[in-house]
Amino acid sequence: MPATVVTITSGKGGVGKTTTTANIAVALAATGDRVVCLDGDIGLRNLDVVMGLENRIVYDLVDVVEGRARLRQALIKDKRLPDLHLIPAAQTRDKAAVSPSDMIKICNDLRAEFDWILIDSPAGIERGFRNAIAAADRVIIVTNPEVSAVRDADRVIGLIEAE
């Protein structure tokens, strides 16, 4: 069965998207599911740090999109869980380096090898958000009790429902 793509998003930064993505990924991989995380936050990646993989990055998502690396070369295997992998975002690239169609292609290329593809979305509702939801089968919206965070989460729900 091909992987399910789940995007973890919110409208506001700092509500716990990256931590939630990492925790769900570890929980799924600990049960034996094959999991790959895609950091969709180009220019501001953090998922590699949260997962303890920041020193193992050779290639990133933009390298794959621009043809400098194959998808398999960008996959970083977790040190503790053999079924957990990461494809990091580029740290120093323009957010426009990846398009929604690029994300769909990458996810489709990964579907046969994994049970779950988790996409850590950047904050906001611009290009990075559109990229992150493009291939999603499911979306998890993370928020906290701040009025602005709940309002932004509601806006994200409306945008997703309109897709």
Predicted regions and their residues:
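Walker A/P-loop phosphate-binding motif and the immediately C-terminal alpha-helix
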Residues: 2-41, 110
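Flexible glycine-/small-residue-rich
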Residues: 10, 39, 88-91, 121, ...
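Glycine-/small-residue-rich active-site loops that bind phosphorylated ligands and cofactors
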Residues: 13, 94-95, 124, 148
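Residue-level recognition of oxygen-bearing side chains
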Residues: 20, 70, 124
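Conserved NTP-handling cores and scaffolds of large molecular machines
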Residues: 28, 32, 42, 54, ...
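Residues at the starts of beta-strands that form the adenosine-phosphate
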Residues: 34, 83, 138
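P-loop/Walker-type NTP enzyme "switch/lid" segment
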Residues: 37-112
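Conserved catalytic-core segment of NTP-binding enzymes
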Residues: 101, 105, 109-112, 116-163
